[in-house]
């Protein structure tokens, strides 16, 4: 069974575990999704190594920017935004770990806002300075 999850702090507000449990069951996917309430991510690679079934995880507040420096590769979107909300865990045949960072906030925002924008829309007030707001800045 593969394991996926969410890292962040605090996670009491998150509905991800329930959502993915239902999704995996409906799609007959042999996987589980767990919330990992991590106060800090300073030793991310070691933490991933302690979870041998972990194939990937989502990243939420306050770690979207902090994880960037600990990843092996970044997608073009993650590089442009400077924040990551999806990490793919690749376990190489020689035993090494590769952590690939992605940002789906940018695509999610731009696809959802595009139908609502008109040429007269030239300014926006963005509240926040975290990883998601950075994606909004890039998206606009």
Question: Would you name each region that the model predicts?
Answer:
Residues 8, 103-106, 113, 117-140:
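Glycine-rich adenosine-cofactor-binding loop
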